[in-house]
Amino acid sequence: MKMPRILLPLFAAAVLAGCAHVPQTASEPSANKGQDMSYTQSVVSKYSFDETVSRLEHAVKAKGMTVFAVIDHQAAAKQSGLSMQPAKVIVFGTPKAGTPLMVKAPEFALQLPLKVLVTETGGEVKAVFNDTRQLIRGSRIGYGEVENTLTNAETLIRKTVGE
């Protein structure tokens, strides 16, 4: 009778040991995925940090879009007794462009409104934003549906700070 009692724990241990070597599936997040910034684009600004933020806000508004928020990460860090480089995220968009996309693919609401980070490191000011093709990747939205809206926002950012 002792033999069957020993076999069950050994079998369970073998199964658990086998599970430890199961490869990661596509649905599981990679430990390095959050570290991968290849989904972003950046433009070196020819303006100061504050001027870059101001120019982007004005350009967005001039195109009829709304600036929903400007998040000052440096100020938030300072309030917590921490220090960091200047970094502001401008959150912007227009329901006219975003709503049809969210109706077609409700989960796309996680990608909107659009955002642009302005940061300064080593004396260099950059505008960093998500690549449009990567934003729509894996969604039911085709590039043709955003090339005259989301892609135009990329062009606006580039022209506003880089030209």
Which ranges hold each PLM region?
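Compact, glycine-rich, soluble single-domain proteins
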Residues: 57, 61-118
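Bacterial N-terminal signal peptides that target proteins for export
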Residues: 1-8
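C-terminal motif of bacterial Sec signal peptides marking the signal peptidase cleavage site
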Residues: 15-18
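Beta-strand/loop substructures that line and gate deep hydrophobic ligand-binding cavities in soluble
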Residues: 115-143
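C-terminal partner/receptor-binding element of secreted or periplasmic proteins
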Residues: 133-163
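Bacterial signal peptide processing site
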Residues: 20-22
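N-terminal secretory signal peptides
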Residues: 25-83
